[in-house]
Regions:
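Glycine-rich phosphate-binding loops at beta-strand->alpha-helix junctions
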Residues: 287-310
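Adenine-nucleotide phosphate-binding core of ATP-dependent small-molecule kinases
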Residues: 231, 235-284
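Glycine-rich phosphate-binding loop of actin/hexokinase-like ATP-binding domains
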Residues: 119-218
Length: 321
């Protein structure tokens, strides 16, 4: 079965056609062109034939713990979660809408980033907030990048020749959005993102975890609206807020050339990353491997492994395709 995979993310739109053996028949990046019309998708696919369309969807809430055939009702449920992932859910919905219009006679399947984390232990998924918040409004740690974390853990186990069931792995998804997962025996037991993709590590334009009182204080002190605070934390913070650029490669380059702001951004990012890896390791009570998923992951790995403790070995870098 040939499947067209559409990944409409917060900063990119990518297409892949997979054959029956999961080999990539073709790959297209539509980040520049966008998906303003169904025709754009049809033209991108060209003469290629496929039997189904798979969609990456960031937030599945409590409704989806696995893939789901997309119906009108499912699409409405996905739309209802947009407030919890404003940078991502709208992009996913646009991709779903355009693809269903372009290929109305094919099955469309939503694969949720939150699904991999849906059975995390209660100690990891539960926030210490009022019971009503948790029961009535579903406030909990959902976690994200689940498709990436699941793949990275599975593929790395294959590469090092060990059974996934026997491994404790910290997977590091380091893109514009960044998160870690503690994967023990193939199961997510902890992760850094939470109710939304804003929690956790320092990211390209997102703040990551901060004192929850900061937004309230800024609303009171600076007179900012809720929307202005959210915009600042989602789009004007992270590396961009510290160094004036959201590109980690540029940050590292500037820092190496003596740029003070870039050096601070690098150090704050690395501090949060090291602390996150330590937390994930503690959640599993040990670790066998750390896996980085990012084009510049080797740069990050070298910085992290330079401070490894006793008994921790560094293996030669191997690319996870």
């Amino acid at each position: 079965m040939r499947i067209l995979v559409l990944n409409a993310g917060s900063s990119s739109i990518k297409l892949r056609l997979l054959d029956a053996n999961d080999a990539v028949a073709f790959s297209r990046d539509l980040s520049t062109e966008g998906l303003k019309t169904p025709r754009a998708l049809v033209e991108a696919v060209g003469e290629s034939e496929f039997e189904a369309v798979g969609h990456r969807v960031v937030h599945g809430g409590t409704s989806f713990s696995g893939p789901a055939i997309i119906t009108g009702q499912v699409q409405e449920k996905i739309a209802s979660l947009e407030e919890l992932a404003p940078l991502h859910q709208a992009a996913s919905l646009e991709g779903i809408t355009r693809a269903r219009q372009a290929f109305p006679n094919l099955p469309h399947v939503a694969c949720f980033d939150t699904a991999f984390h849906s059975d995390m232990p209660a100690a990891a998924s539960t926030y210490a907030v009022p019971l009503q918040w948790r029961e009535r409004f579903g406030v909990r740690r959902y976690g994200f990048h689940g498709l990436s974390h699941a793949y990275a853990s599975r593929r790395s186990a294959e590469m090092i020749g060990r059974s996934l069931d026997s491994l404790r792995i910290v997977t590091c998804h380091l893109g514009a959005g960044a998160s870690l997962a503690a994967v023990a025996g193939g199961r997510s037991v902890d992760t850094t993102m939470g109710l939304t993709p804003l929690e956790g590590l320092v990211m390209a334009t997102r703040s990551g975890s901060i004192d929850p009182s900061v937004p309230l204080w800024m609303q009171s002190r600076a007179g900012l609206t809720r929307a202005e605070v959210q915009e600042a934390l989602e789009r004007d913070s992270g590396l961009a807020g510290l160094a004036g650029t959201a590109d980690m490669r540029e940050v590292l380059k500037r820092a190496a050339n003596g740029d003070v702001g870039a050096a601070l951004a690098r150090d704050v990012y690395m501090h949060a990353l090291r602390a996150g890896i330590a937390r994930m390791t503690a959640s599993m009570r040990g670790i066998e491997a750390v896996v980085y998923r990012w084009g510049g992951g080797a740069l990050i790995r070298d910085s992290i492994s330079g401070r490894r403790g006793p008994g921790v070995s560094r293996y030669p870098a191997r690319r996870v395709p």
